[in-house]
Swiss-Prot record:
Name the UniProt record assigns to this protein: Isocitrate dehydrogenase kinase/phosphatase
Swiss-Prot/TrEMBL catalytic activity: L-seryl-[isocitrate dehydrogenase] + ATP = O-phospho-L-seryl-[isocitrate dehydrogenase] + ADP + H(+)
GO cellular component, one term: cytoplasm
Organism lineage string: Bacteria, Pseudomonadati, Pseudomonadota, Betaproteobacteria, Burkholderiales
Name of the gene: aceK
Coiled-coil residues: none
UniProt family annotation: Belongs to the AceK family.
């Protein structure tokens, strides 16, 4: 820009900036209130209430943005504010953020509002926050009544057992613990099993984030152990062993275990953060290498995560030279998928037209993606980032990809200043398609992949999700070896499905027919018919029948549906259930109801 205002002379500019910040502050207050309510719901064991709260919080941000846009249009005729005033609005906003506790999130809110009002030609750092303006380094809430981001404990003074007990009791959870000294003993034993004996350095200390992380039926204590130059992460899930009684379920001591519980295939945590950047910085120390965008998303600030991701993409494009290409693998009927090999994500666009047998619409597919966003994903469904008006340099697009885009999605394309602007797309983490993983893998890979696939579908089933198209190509294998579902255009609630057995053939002609001899309704599912599509490879068939022979029995599916209709919410664990204390150290527990279901070593990661 050639001219930037030297004098902030516009009263409207200040008023608009203040109005936008007031609306952001309202949004963040509601965000924090949800986390406080989550603690109460958790203490009372109100799991349906927690699910409702998590769903409502996901839509809250867009509601607040819409409200803010309406206020600006009604009171300030925002669409007709001239360019110089918009520049002053941004500068006033920056000034208002100098002592703010969530400046990075407030900047993102500003962008969201502006993108609803301004043409995309204004999406530059002159008018919106393409780059952050306010530093979040060393940001802390220093108000007397505020909780610190984390608390430091020194086991060398009072001993490790006493310190661990103080850490747990400081969260002041209302229900009593079944046997907290026993659980503390299990934590200490697990630490010894993992690290053996270690000498305590002068700086031996434990840092614990001041708020609990709530998700599903667990509340997580998250922290780090510091000893000499070592930083050891940990997370302790607290669960109800029976109504009104709590227990420490396990302790997770490996970075890869924490990476999974904070992973992109899980629903967002509810956690009360006065200074979110300080929480994210802390989490970065225990999960180095995990992008800040993913961490912000995992703690419920998905719009901030989305903003950071887009900045990461622009930065990567500035420091790379490879081209976007059509994604390897079997082409989908509904989605056009492409990727940048040097960037670990895929870009998915809904096609303009769908060939038979697909009978759906763009609006219906977008609603399916929203269903997944709102639903508890249990570590088995990939999160997606949804973007509008994405401009990609034409010079970075492979010619074959451009031809495919012009063929399949011409209605969503616009050429502008050397860029191809795509009206709407989704972005997901890139995974190895399960069909390729099974096709190219060793025998042990095949066993792992098939076992994970069956577990994934069964866990989705218990969570009221019917994948629809269950072919292996619609599932991916993450870098941690977990199988995750990522094709959502045929997804349905299991409770909306009619589970049926295949009727016996009426005669020999029926038996030899390649077509069903029975009527099939739009919501009918026939688990007995899945075998031919899933068991064609002899290696896969043998392993599948070894681990998941019940998969093709309609009774399995109907039982899950019946429990859901009765309001039952099953237990899920984002870690191997063999790590649960009641399984790992059974002698410490004796005969207790904590062991119910522990033998099913599911991985709901």
């Amino acid at each position: 820009m050639n001219h930037f205002p030297k004098l902030l002379s516009s009263q409207i500019g200040f008023d608009v900036a203040q109005t936008m910040l007031e609306n952001f502050d309202r949004h963040y207050r509601i965000f924090r209130e949800a986390a406080v309510e989550a603690k109460t719901l958790y203490e009372h064991g109100d799991w349906h209430g927690l699910q409702r709260l998590a769903r409502e919080r996901i839509t809250s941000y867009d509601d607040r943005v819409k409200e803010c846009v309406e206020v600006l249009e009604d009171e300030y005729d925002a669409e007709n504010i001239d360019d110089e005033v918009w520049q002053q609005i941004k500068l006033h906003y920056i000034g208002l953020l100098t002592s703010h506790r969530q400046p990075e999130c407030a900047e993102t809110f500003f962008n969201s509002v502006c993108c609803k009002i301004l043409h995309r030609s204004y999406f530059s750092n002159d008018f919106i926050f393409v780059r952050p303006a306010i530093s979040t380094e060393y940001l802390e809430n220093d108000e007397p009544a505020a909780k610190p981001t984390y608390r430091a404990y020194y086991p060398g003074t009072d001993g490790l057992a006493t310190t661990l007990e103080r850490i747990v009791t400081n969260f002041q959870l209302e229900p009593a613990f079944d046997d907290l000294p026993r659980d503390i003993g299990c934590v200490m034993q697990a630490i010894h099993d993992e690290f053996g004996h270690f000498d305590e350095a002068p700086n031996f200390q434990i840092h614990v984030l001041s708020s609990l992380f709530f998700r599903n039926k667990s509340a997580y204590i998250v922290g780090r152990i510091i000893n000499a130059d070592r930083v050891l992460p940990f997370a302790v899930p607290i669960r109800h062993v029976r109504p009104g009684v709590l227990s420490l379920d396990t302790v997770l001591l490996r970075r890869d275990q924490l990476m999974i519980i904070f992973g992109f295939s899980h629903s967002y945590f509810l956690v009360d953060m006065g200074v979110p950047s300080a929480y994210v910085d802390f989490l970065c120390t225990i999960m180095p290498g995990k992008p800040k965008a993913e961490i912000y998303t995992s703690v419920g600030l998905q719009k901030q995560g989305k903003n950071l991701f887009y900045r990461d993409l622009l930065h990567h494009l500035s420091h790379s030279s490879d081209r976007f290409i059509i994604a390897p693998g079997i082409k989908g009927l509904v989605m056009l998928v492409f990727t940048l090999p040097s960037f670990p994500y895929v870009f998915k666009i809904i096609k303009d037209h769908f060939p038979p047998p697909k009978e759906t619409t763009r609006a219906q597919i977008m609603e399916k993606y929203q269903l997944v966003k709102r639903h508890d994903r249990l570590g088995r469904m990939a999160d997606t980032l949804e973007y509008s008006s994405v401009a990609l340099p034409i010079a970075r697009l492979d010619h074959a990809l451009v031809r495919e885009l012009e063929k399949e999605v011409p209605s969503l394309l616009e050429y502008e200043d050397g860029n191809l602007v795509i009206e709407h797309l989704y972005i997901e983490r890139r995974m190895t398609p399960l069909n390729l993983y099974l096709q190219n893998g060793s025998d042990s890979d095949v066993e792992h992949g098939v076992k994970e696939y069956g577990n994934a579908v069964k866990e989705l089933m218990k969570a009221n999700i019917f994948p629809g198209d269950m072919l292996y190509k619609n599932f991916g294998v993450t870098r941690h070896g977990r199988v995750v579902f990522y094709d959502y255009d045929e997804i349905e609630y299991l409770t909306d499905c009619n589970v049926r057995r295949v009727p016996p053939p009426r005669n020999e002609e029926d038996e030899l027919s390649g077509e069903p001899w029975y009527t099939v309704g739009p919501h009918d599912i026939f688990p007995e018919t899945y075998g031919p599509f899933l068991l064609g490879d002899p290696r896969v068939r043998d392993v599948f029948m070894k681990h998941h022979a019940d998969f093709f029995d309609p009774a399995l599916w109907q039982a899950s549906k019946d429990k859901l209709i009765q309001g039952e919410l099953p237990d899920f664990y984002p870690y191997d259930t063999a790590l649960r204390f009641c399984t790992r150290y059974p002698a410490r527990f004796g005969a207790t109801d904590q062991n119910d279901g522990a033998g099913d070593a599911q991985r709901a990661a």
